[in-house]
């Protein structure tokens, strides 16, 4: 009997730990959020860019039918009408094709899933043709009725955990995830996505749901689909949106036993550092000592679709594409550092925080256009196509799991470190030049700086760095240079 109980406990432990595995294909790293992209465009991007440049995965916008709102703001995607797979990004057939095409080139798909709530008042018509009556909590496309929701009340006090989890977030009708029928419908939706080949989920508004209810839902999920190249017994990678900056009733530690969390403190802290509010020298102990969750429980990012607009956590300290030099430096630090699972933001340009993606006619999403230097146009920012970012994904892949060594700083805002003997990176956020002889940890030779250029055959399109037989190199980053960072690695040796 004791042995049987032990086996059951071990089996549960194995299941529990499986959902912290990203399910990335071997030798790849870095997830990119292709915010509001169409499924057909993501499929092509996997084949033409993400696969060849070593990216591991894509977080996609919500896939299920949402309320059609006037002016088509981005946030309409977070107002579910049903779990039918039809949005402005495409229909179920297009979604399924995208997942297969991306998996075929080693790029995994992670879906932003919204099941804390349904659409708020005014969301009466959906992108798939379904109708709803939010005022009476009727969503026949699922179907959900008033029996499936918590009582109507507003969240006004974030120090009251019951209110945060049982009341309505900005008027969005709050589903009762403790209701077995609601659980069944959510699990059905998620398992359908698993059947189609997805690798995991970003759970929107997880903080607003009871951890015990989420545990039941996650525990009911199928194993990943082996027809899409996943190992037998693999479980969905789960990232829960939990904004925890401290000082509230709800803590991320309530959720880290269930899956990873979105580590908003990382975004806030990296923004403060590269905006010059904290000196870079203090990044020497970057990680849990900064108040972050454990590395394997932390999805880390410089910005996300909410806080780049001033929503969520971080405020004015959050770095975005609008301050490109500091943004590239912070992104390079995130990708060079072993802490956490990094996610790169890929935005569309905006001046109004409600503004939706570029369209062809005010309704239908426009495809991005690509320039000869890999960058995007047509209203799409495509940070993931910036050389300084995609080459750092290559850096991360080259250094693997090697530890940080050879930390150097000038006592201020110039820092450098190696990743074992495979990669080296240096930063200058001071208002004067960096010119120092630094230990790189790398074998002797000449290397291409993958920030200013790329290796092309036996030559380099940017700066080169010569490492001596003692591992040292003269590192130079001028304060007025476009990029305040330099990076070399073994795969960029000339």
UniProtKB/Swiss-Prot annotation:
Phylogenetic lineage: Eukaryota, Metazoa, Ecdysozoa, Arthropoda, Hexapoda
Protein name: Alpha-amylase 2
Binding positions for Ca(2+) per the UniProt entry: 116, 165, 174, 208
Cysteines engaged in disulfide bonds, as pairs: 46-102, 153-167, 376-382, 448-460
EC number: 3.2.1.1
GO molecular function: alpha-amylase activity; metal ion binding
GO biological process: carbohydrate metabolic process
PANTHER family: ALPHA-AMYLASE (PTHR43447)
Coiled coil: none
Site (Transition state stabilizer): 306
Reactions catalysed: Endohydrolysis of (1->4)-alpha-D-glucosidic linkages in polysaccharides containing three or more (1->4)-alpha-linked D-glucose units
Subunit structure: Monomer.
Signal peptide positions on this chain: 1-18
Active-site residues (renumbered): 204, 241
Cofactor: Ca(2+); chloride
Residues annotated for chloride binding in this entry: 202, 304, 343
Residue numbers spanned by region Disordered: 350-370
Stored Gene3D superfamilies: Glycosidases, Golgi alpha-mannosidase II
Low complexity composition bias: residue spans: 351-363
């Amino acid at each position: 009997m004791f042995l049987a109980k032990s086996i059951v406990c071990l089996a549960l432990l194995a299941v529990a730990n499986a959902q912290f595995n990203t399910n990335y294909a071997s030798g790849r790293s870095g997830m990119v959020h292709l915010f509001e992209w169409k499924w057909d465009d993501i499929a092509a991007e996997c084949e033409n860019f993400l696969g060849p440049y070593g990216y591991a995965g894509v977080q996609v916008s919500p896939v299920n039918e949402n309320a059609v709102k006037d002016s088509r703001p981005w946030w309409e995607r977070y107002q579910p009408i049903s779990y039918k797979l039809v949005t402005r990004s495409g229909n179920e057939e297009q979604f399924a094709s995208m997942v297969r095409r991306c998996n075929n080139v080693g790029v995994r798909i992670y879906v932003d899933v919204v099941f804390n709530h349904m659409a708020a008042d005014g969301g009466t018509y959906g992108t798939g043709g379904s109708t709803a009556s939010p005022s009476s909590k009727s969503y026949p496309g699922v179907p959900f009725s008033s029996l499936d929701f918590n009582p109507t009340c507003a969240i006004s006090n974030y120090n009251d955990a019951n209110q945060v989890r049982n009341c309505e977030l900005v008027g969005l009708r709050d589903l009762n995830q403790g209701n077995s029928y609601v659980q069944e419908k959510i699990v059905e939706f998620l398992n359908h996505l698993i059947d189609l080949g997805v690798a995991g989920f970003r759970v929107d508004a997880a903080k607003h749901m009871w951890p015990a209810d989420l545990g039941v839902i996650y525990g009911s999920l199928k194993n990943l689909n082996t027809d899409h190249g996943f190992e037998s017994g693999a479980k969905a990678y789960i990232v829960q949106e939990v904004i925890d900056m401290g000082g509230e009733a709800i803590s991320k530690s309530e959720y880290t036993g269930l899956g990873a969390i979105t580590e908003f403190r990382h975004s806030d802290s990296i923004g403060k550092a590269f905006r010059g509010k904290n000196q870079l020298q203090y990044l020497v102990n970057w990680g849990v000592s900064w108040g972050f969750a454990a590395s394997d429980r932390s999805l880390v990012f410089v910005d996300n679709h909410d806080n780049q607009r001033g929503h969520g956590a971080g405020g004015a300290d959050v770095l975005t594409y609008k301050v490109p030099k500091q943004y590239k430096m912070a992104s390079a630090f995130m990708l060079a550092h072993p802490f956490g699972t990094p996610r790169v933001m890929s935005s569309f340009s905006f001046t109004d925080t409600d503004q939706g993606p570029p369209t062809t006619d005010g309704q239908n999403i426009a495809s991005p256009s690509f320039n000869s230097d890999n960058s995007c146009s047509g209203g799409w920012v495509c940070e993931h196509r910036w050389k300084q970012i995609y080459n750092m994904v290559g850096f991360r892949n080259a250094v693997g799991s090697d530890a940080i060594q050879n930390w150097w700083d000038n006592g201020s805002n110039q820092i450098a470190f190696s990743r074992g003997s495979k990669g080296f990176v240096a930063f200058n956020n001071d208002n004067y030049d960096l010119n120092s002889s630094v230990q790189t940890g790398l074998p002797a030779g000449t290397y291409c700086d993958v920030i200013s250029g790329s290796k092309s055959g036996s030559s380099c399109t940017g700066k080169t760095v010569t490492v001596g037989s003692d591992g040292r190199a003269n590192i130079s980053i001028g304060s007025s240079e476009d990029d305040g960072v330099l990076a070399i690695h073994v795969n960029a040796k000339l």
